Amino acid sequence: MIMFRDEFNSVCNAAKGKMALLNNNPAGYFMSAMVAGAFITLGGFVTFTLGSILTAAGCTITKVIMAFSFASALSLVVMAGAELFTGNNFVMAAASFKKEVSWLDTLKLWVVCYLGNFVGAVILVALFQLGGVPKGATGEYFATIAAGKMGGTASTLFFKGMLCNMLVCLAVWCCTKMKTESGKLIMIFWCIYIFM
């Protein structure tokens, strides 16, 4: 008997469901991807705002608190059933390797999902800007974090992104295995804690 056969089949069935949604309701799929991008942006905004406040207060465990805070972003995505590119890398690749979904369909879904995530993130950033946030010390903190994240070489950024994506995929896999919503949330928090 193969370990985790049922869970792996659930992942493949989820991939087929994602493809069906994309094929039957492309606008609905794109909207779901936009929502995921907005949730990740919202989680990032809350995390970095919190980081700004804690850093200014001289907190010595700012990074630990920020890690737990950012886990809220993926929690929102998973619990709402939104379409996130990084999680879909695992789901769609698994189904493609099992030949449940074609690689061409997987690539199509990845492109649409990535674009939807990007558009959702940009819209939320625009809303933050129009709302006057972030500004002052918080805005400066955001700029410092962004500069630090983009300060590496292209290969360094690529491999860091790959490692982060592995942890998101692990969180998605753990959510497949967990039988309760609380179990899913706990595993998301642990995977994203490592990520940060």
Regions found by a protein language model. Give the residues of each.
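Alpha-helical transmembrane segments and their helix-helix packing motifs
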Residues: 2-196
